[in-house]
From Swiss-Prot:
One of its GO terms (biological process) is proteolysis. Belongs to the peptidase C48 family. Protease that catalyzes two essential functions in the SUMO pathway. The first is the hydrolysis of an alpha-linked peptide bond at the C-terminal end of the small ubiquitin-like modifier (SUMO) propeptides, SUMO1, SUMO2 and SUMO3 leading to the mature form of the proteins. The second is the deconjugation of SUMO1, SUMO2 and SUMO3 from targeted proteins, by cleaving an epsilon-linked peptide bond between the C-terminal glycine of the mature SUMO and the lysine epsilon-amino group of the target protein. Deconjugates SUMO1 from HIPK2. This is Sentrin-specific protease 1. The active site is at H534, D551, C604 (nucleophile). Interacts with RBM33; promoting ALKBH5 desumoylation and subsequent activation. Residues 92-117, 285-313 are annotated as: Disordered. GO terms for molecular function: deSUMOylase activity; SUMO-specific endopeptidase activity. InterPro entries: Papain-like_cys_pep_sf (IPR038765), Peptidase_C48_C (IPR003653). The gene is SENP1.
Length: 645
């Protein structure tokens, strides 16, 4: 028996695991004192074993989980024992990895051994896979005599700290850097937001269109690029996350190939960034041939990163290939935020805004140049007339006439400029400031045209507040009152609710609104149009036979013009008992280049009122956005005194 015991001596391999800067070694060495009656197994086979020395080093990242392959034999033979002096103890750490509490013994002579199977112990996961040793595996293998004789008790590992384990099971999430944004103070930004609000409420399209900024472009694009980067990193790191269980081969060529692959594995370092347990290859029970099922989440196999060998097994042993990936642990190798792309995209956004701003400036310059050319042409005509007068009339008679004519023209121009923008005196300024002070909001400040203006209504003219219906109706009535003066066209202005009622309820709902008014007897009809959050103006000019739509945001609304033309037809039949002659009538919508445009989201009501003011005086529309603060103060004084300046 001593000879048999000497031949049965076996020294198991040593598996080294490098994880979180800690080294755990597993020495699978049986204890001595095996009974003689248990040495004879089925068919009294005495199997010679070959010592397989496997030294695999797996380098794991801080956020990656690691696994420790444990190798043992299902069919131990009588020559797989050591002397009584080589006593080995085994311990199991908290995460399911096996270690040896005693130093490994020196290498012994290698012997051939048949039917040796290698199994992979994996850490217990949430899917129900548990760490099982000594014959109990996930594939329901039977318990061998060797395992019954040499049970291995788990021993808690003091070297495996709880904090390290917690760092593996629940790694700290990477804190994303918050992106700071600059507050937009440019008027074009407010104008763009206001234009988008109008499109949402009215469903109309406006001529000046800019890229929408509901969600910042640089953030959405960076998120999409981060997703692509994450996919690439998972693709690269996933290829190095597989472990294999290699069964022993009875032939010498199979054993040699296993040793060759083991030597290659001993010099390889694998990066396991993230894993989830997933079986990617199964061994046939009879033939041991590897079958590779295709999964939608599996990654392609790279032979440079992982060495694998297809082996055959005898009896009921099976070869299992496991691919382990962790879907819950994020990979730190790829950044979720690329600063360079963000800077480029942010720069492109601001470049587009700058180009839009420059385009608007060019349009305003072109409009100013056009007005200047018109004035120069008028001056040229006046100079031409004066030259002809000099040629016809003697010089001594021409001098006083010319001087009188020039003086009259200069005086007329000064009067026009003073009428268009009269100066607000200090007394007027004090009165206006007094109105804007805090007081009783229901206090009546002005009353006329069967309308009452309170302090609350006047507050809509302060700063950038939106004008309400009472202010606009009161101002339109003042325009009607001024039209009674000599030399001005007669005007009738409809209520601010007229067009909305006409559009929604039809002519029958508004035909009594003109019971005491003959709309065909005036020169101009003013129709304020409210689009929910925006004020516009429609003008019916019976002298020129046209209906024109004015929008300070550049909107086109030919539908409103058609509704008003249809109203004139029905009004003529109802009041005049005859059809309205539409021959020669034209419908227009003023473009943004033809009339002044608002540069914020607050002055649409002021623009509509000032459009009506210029049209009812037969004056060109020559104001701009810069005049709006002046017009607001001026309108306060005009409403308080019920008189236009």
């Amino acid at each position: 028996m001593d000879d048999i015991a000497d031949r049965m001596r076996m020294d198991a391999g040593e598996v080294t695991l490098v994880n979180h800067n800690s080294v755990f070694k597993t020495h699978l060495l049986p204890q001595t004192g095996f009974p003689e009656d248990q040495l004879s197994l089925s068919d009294q086979q005495i199997l010679s074993s070959r010592q397989g020395y496997l030294d695999r080093s797996f380098t794991c990242s801080t956020r990656s989980a690691a696994y420790n392959p444990s190798y043992y034999s299902d069919n131990p033979s009588s020559d797989s024992f050591l002397g009584s002096g080589d006593l080995r103890t085994f311990g199991q750490s908290a995460n399911g990895q096996w270690r040896n509490s005693t130093p490994s013994s020196s290498s012994s002579l290698q012997k051939s051994r048949n039917s040796r199977s290698l199994y992979l112990e994996t850490r217990k996961t949430s899917s129900g896979l548990s760490n099982i040793f000594a014959g109990k595996s996930n594939h329901h293998c039977h318990v061998s005599a060797y395992e019954k004789s040499f049970p291995i008790k788990p021993v808690p590992s003091p070297s495996w700290s709880g904090s390290c384990r917690r760092s593996l099971l629940s790694p700290k999430k990477t804190q994303r850097r918050h992106v700071s944004t600059a507050e937009e103070t440019v008027q074009e930004e407010e104008r763009e937001i206001y234009r988008q609000l109008l499109q949402m409420v009215t469903g109309k399209q406006f001529t000046i269109a800019k890229p929408t900024t509901h969600f910042p472009l640089h953030l959405s694009r960076c998120l999409s690029s981060s997703k692509n980067t994450l996919k690439d990193s998972l693709f690269k790191n996933g290829n190095s996350c597989a472990s294999q269980i290699i069964g022993s081969d009875t032939s010498s060529s199979g054993s040699a190939s296993i040793l060759t692959n083991q030597e290659q594995l001993s010099h390889s370092v694998y990066s396991l960034s993230s894993y989830t347990p997933d079986v990617v290859a199964f061994g046939s029970k009879d033939s041991g041939t590897l079958h590779h099922p295709h999964h939608h989440h599996s990654v392609p196999h790279q032979p440079d990163n992982l060495a694998a060998s297809n082996t055959q097994s005898e009896g009921s042993d099976s070869v299992i290939l496991l691919k382990v990936k962790d879907s819950q642990t994020p990979t730190p190798s790829s950044t979720f935020f690329q600063a360079e792309l963000w800077i480029k995209e942010l720069t492109s956004v601001y470049d587009s805004r700058a180009r839009e701003r420059l385009r608007q400036i060019e349009e305003q310059k072109a409009l100013a140049l056009q007005l200047q050319n018109q004035r120069l042409q008028e001056r040229e005509h006046s100079v031409h007339d004066s030259v002809e007068l000099h040629l016809r009339v003697p010089l001594e008679k021409e001098i006083p006439v010319t001087v009188a004519q020039e003086t009259q023209k200069k005086g007329h121009k000064l009067t026009d400029s003073e009428d268009e923008f009269p100066e607000i005196t200090e007394e007027m300024e004090k009165e206006i400031k007094n109105v804007f002070r805090n007081g009783n909001q229901d206090e009546v400040l002005s009353e006329a045209f069967r309308l009452t203006i309170t302090r609350k209504d006047i507050q809509t003219l302060n700063h950038l507040n939106w004008l309400n219906d009472e202010i606009i109706n009161f101002y339109m009535n003042m325009l009607m009152e001024r039209s009674k003066e000599k030399g001005l066209p007669s005007v009738h202005a409809f209520n601010t609710f007229f067009f909305t009622k006409l559009k929604t309820a039809g002519y029958q709902a508004v035909k009594r609104w003109t019971k005491k008014v003959d709309v065909f007897s005036v020169d101009i009809l003013l129709v304020p149009i409210h689009l929910g959050v925006h004020w516009c103006l429609a003008v019916v000019d019976f002298r020129k036979k046209n209906i024109t739509y004015y929008d300070s945001m550049g909107g086109i609304n030919n539908e409103a013009c058609r509704i008003l033309l249809q109203y004139l037809k029905q009004e003529s039949i109802d009041k005049k008992r005859k059809e309205f002659d539409t021959n020669g009538w034209q419908l227009f919508s003023k473009k943004s280049q033809e009339i002044p445009q608002q540069m914020n989201g607050s002055d649409c009501g002021m623009f509509a009122c000032k459009y009506a003011d210029c049209i009812t005086k037969d004056r060109p529309i020559n104001f701009t956005q810069q005049h709006m603060p002046y017009f607001r103060k001026r309108m306060v004084w005009e409403i308080l005194h019920r008189k236009l300046l």
